[in-house]
Swiss-Prot record:
Keyword annotations of the record: Oxidoreductase
Gene name of the encoded protein: msrA
EC assignment: 1.8.4.11
Species for this entry: Clostridium botulinum (strain Kyoto / Type A2)
Family to which the UniProt record says this protein belongs: Belongs to the MsrA Met sulfoxide reductase family.
GO molecular function: L-methionine-(S)-S-oxide reductase activity; peptide-methionine (S)-S-oxide reductase activity
Catalysed reactions listed for this entry: L-methionyl-[protein] + [thioredoxin]-disulfide + H2O = L-methionyl-(S)-S-oxide-[protein] + [thioredoxin]-dithiol; [thioredoxin]-disulfide + L-methionine + H2O = L-methionine (S)-S-oxide + [thioredoxin]-dithiol
Protein name per its UniProtKB record: Peptide methionine sulfoxide reductase MsrA
Domain of life per record: Bacteria
Amino acid sequence: MKEIVLAGGCFWGVEEYMSRIEGIVETKVGYANGIKENPSYEEVCSGVTGHAEACYIKYDESIISLEELLNKFWSIIDPTVLNKQGNDRGTQYRTCIFYLDEKDLNVIIKSKYQEQKNYRKPIVTEVEPLKCFYEAEEYHQKYLKKNPGGYCHIHLD
């Protein structure tokens, strides 16, 4: 099994979208690469902790490759916009690819390069090693499964 953490705006929609993909075996939402240990949702939303709302993904590489997974990720975000996705604004809504395995970096860079060909503006999606990931509060986990009419900036239909 492989792991990656993706940030694409509000984590509810990213998690719900990713959980529907064949080969994804686990998802959980949380706060990635900030400066405060174990922050609360309110602290992250204040913008002072530096965390991104993110989705941890465990996937079966024999079913879906990292390249395919990243192509799906690019399809649900606007990678040219800084600190905003949909109606959500703030540094916690920036787009990021956080890798856990250094061997994945070349695939990620190649994918970002290929995606750039679709845009005139530069892609601002961060590519960084995962430094920390704190699971979000339980009410955020599988939020759109528990609240099917809940807010989502991603078109899930």
